[in-house]
Amino acid sequence: MAVGNINELPENILLELFTHVPARQLLLNCRLVCSLWRDLIDLVTLWKRKCLREGFITEDWDQPVADWKIFYFLRSLHRNLLHNPCAEEGFEFWSLDVNGGDEWKVEDLSRDQRKEFPNDQVKKYFVTSYYTCLKSQVVDLKAEGYWEELMDTTRPDIEVKDWFAARPDCGSKYQLCVQLLSSAHAPLGTFQPDPATIQQKSDAKWREVSHTFSNYPPGVRYIWFQHGGVDTHYWAGWYGPRVTNSSITIGPPLP
């Protein structure tokens, strides 16, 4: 039997059609068409289907979700918000705040180092010198797709990670500071662990530092990330801590 009006289709068919429509178009356009479409687009079922279809959850997903629509958007936006975290583009996107000694430098991970590093996609790192070297990056959340209401109402977890290592032949000191900033760049949350001092003749293994911001105040619009360090023997060259594979992610990770 021919259907003259799309609204005459069974609701389950309409829901299936909506799973193929981009999420922003559903909310900004389709939801305004009529009350039927609005009610269908607001159904939990639709957003669970979209999550499943796009691989954001698995068939056997059993974890509680407070709001499937928000969950979908957080999953779709989930990625590393720091650009050029592994020095593949030199110092592009980074601000060299303090460039002491022989200044910041990019080096390649050796074949042995690649075997030891937990991510085989990482091939380069940034290295510091005999006077303090610090570099930073500011993440503009709105520019990255995280609108103000989402950040203020949902306040999703913000996870920060960084990797650092010393040289086996020289001691070094590594430092990290991450701040959640308001629209006026006032700090609303800070993670600044004590500097990590690594002694000479250490194992030179790569170490991960991580922190999750939760239940922070509303108003977060930017994230400021700064790291670096210095060697503790003041040797000419690049004997300070090495850093790479830094990341800032928001919301639940992909399965």
Swiss-Prot record:
Domain F-box: 3-50
Coiled coil stretches, renumbered: none
Domain FBA: 71-252
Keyword annotations of the record: Ubl conjugation pathway
InterPro entries named in the record: F-box-assoc_dom, F-box-like_dom_sf, F-box_dom, F-box_only, Galactose-bd-like_sf
Cellular component terms per the entry's GO annotation: cytoplasm; cytosol; SCF ubiquitin ligase complex
Entry keyword annotation includes DNA-binding: no
Pfam families (alphabetical): F-box-like (PF12937), FBA (PF04300)
Tissue occurrence: Abundantly expressed in brain and kidney. Expressed at lower levels in heart, spleen and liver.
One GO BP: SCF-dependent proteasomal ubiquitin-dependent protein catabolic process
Translocase listed as a keyword: no
Misc remark: In contrast to other FBA domain containing proteins, FBXO44 demonstrates no significant binding to any of the 200 glycans tested.
Function: Substrate-recognition component of the SCF (SKP1-CUL1-F-box protein)-type E3 ubiquitin ligase complex.
Assembly and oligomerization: Part of a SCF (SKP1-cullin-F-box) protein ligase complex. Interacts with SKP1 and CUL1.
Name assigned to this protein: F-box only protein 44
